[in-house]
C-alpha cells in the first residue's frame, strides 16, 4: 500500500497558501457501511460539532451530508457582549452596537480558499441566532426571564469536515489548514497538521 493520496501536494498547497489563510485539504475514502450518523458517533467531536443532512424540496434526500468536528474557535453572545473561545483561552469582546457586526469583524480575519473537487459548502461559521436577536434591530419590550440562560447566538468554526457523497458512496475527509504566516516553516507546519488530523479522523472511522 502506497502513501495516502491527498487532494493537494505540498507544492500545490504552497501556491494556494499565497492567496489566503484557510486552505482545505482532503482525502477521499469509501463509505462502505458508514453513515453520517454512525460516523458522528465515532469521531472525537466533544461538545462542539454538527451534522447537516441535505434535503431538496422538503422530501428528497440530496447528494451531500456534512459533519463538522473539532472547534478551534467558538463565538457566542451573552448580555450584549461577545466571547471568543479558542482552546483554553476565552476572550471577552466588549459590546459596541450590533453584536453581529463584531462577529463580522472576527470573521474578516479568515480568508478561505476554494479548491477543486469540493462542493460549495466546506465549513465556516455554523450556529444559530435566537428569536430574541430581533431586539438588536427592533425596539421591543423587555423580554421575560430566560430559564435556560442560553446565548442569543453561538457559532463555531470546525477544522475537520466529513462530506458524505450519498450518490458515489464516498467520504471526503477535509481538514482546514490555518496558515498563520507566509513563511515556509508555517506553511509546512499547517500542511503537516492538516494531514495528521485527516489520518486521525480516518483511523477513528475504521474502528
Residue ranges and their predicted role:
Residues 2-49, 54-95, 131-207:
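Extended accessory regions or peripheral subdomains of proteins
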Residues 52-56, 116-121:
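Short coil/turn segments at secondary-structure boundaries
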Residues 98-119:
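FAD-binding glycine-rich core of flavoenzymes that anchor FAD
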Residues 124:
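Catalytic beta-strand/loop module used to bind and position nucleotide/cofactor moieties
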Amino acid at each position: 500500500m502506497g502513501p495516502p493520496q491527498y487532494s493537494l501536494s505540498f507544492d500545490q498547497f504552497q501556491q494556494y497558501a499565497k492567496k489566503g489563510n484557510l486552505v482545505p485539504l482532503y482525502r477521499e475514502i469509501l463509505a462502505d457501511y458508514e453513515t453520517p450518523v454512525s460516523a458522528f458517533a465515532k469521531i472525537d467531536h466533544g461538545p462542539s460539532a454538527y451534522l447537516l443532512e441535505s434535503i431538496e424540496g422538503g422530501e428528497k434526500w440530496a447528494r451531500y451530508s456534512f459533519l463538522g468536528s473539532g472547534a478551534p474557535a467558538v463565538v457566542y453572545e451573552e448580555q450584549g457582549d461577545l466571547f471568543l473561545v479558542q482552546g483554553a483561552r476565552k476572550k471577552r469582546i466588549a459590546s459596541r452596537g450590533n453584536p453581529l457586526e463584531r462577529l463580522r469583524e472576527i470573521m474578516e480575519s479568515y480568508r478561505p480558499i476554494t479548491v477543486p473537487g469540493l462542493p460549495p459548502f466546506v465549513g465556516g461559521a455554523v450556529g444559530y441566532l435566537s428569536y430574541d436577536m430581533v431586539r438588536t434591530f427592533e425596539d421591543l419590550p423587555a423580554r421575560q426571564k430566560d430559564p435556560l440562560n442560553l446565548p442569543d447566538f453561538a457559532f463555531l468554526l470546525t477544522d475537520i469536515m466529513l462530506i458524505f457523497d450519498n450518490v458515489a458512496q464516498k467520504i471526503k475527509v477535509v481538514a482546514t489548514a490555518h496558515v498563520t504566516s507566509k513563511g515556509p516553516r508555517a506553511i509546512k507546519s499547517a500542511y503537516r497538521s492538516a494531514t495528521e488530523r485527516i489520518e486521525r479522523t480516518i483511523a477513528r472511522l475504521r474502528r
